[in-house]
Amino acid sequence: AVVAKPKTVRRAKPVFRPGGFIYELNVRGFTMRHPDVPEKLRGTVAALAHPAIIEHLQRLGVSEVELMPVTAWIDERHLPPLGLANGWGYNPVTFMALDPRLAPGGLADLRHAVAALHGAGIGVILDLVFNHTGESDALGTSLSLRGLDSRAYYRHAADGQLINDTGTGNTV
């Protein structure tokens, strides 16, 4: 293992404004077709730092953006056979790693976007999913927590079946 001291990053303190306007957005959906955002940035976290996106949010009077999940997720297993995909991010396979489809540049992309938004006076709220995973029910794929130790991470009934309080097949 290689251990490296992370770079010190100066972070702007968020400014709380009572009565603000929180705009919830799906990163991919919000930035994918904006004509002023360079094509290579569209659909990514990095696009949120583009002046056209920031100007649009400012024109709307947005005080904070709430980013729908940006951590790695998987499609529900019934979607691919139908030619469909999940773009919402609510089926996480990990809790803290960014989805490479949204942040191909990794954490640097998110840091840059947050710094640009903060610099424009716009706060950032991350929507995180901690109550279930995309591993689904007993028939789902073992990708992370289930493969490590299903009983330690997921709630199980006395008979060993996964408890499904979330409607997704499992409850953490």
Model segments located where?
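The feature marks proteins involved in alpha-glucan
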Residues: 1-26, 31-43
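Substrate-binding/active-site clefts of carbohydrate-active enzymes
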Residues: 28-172
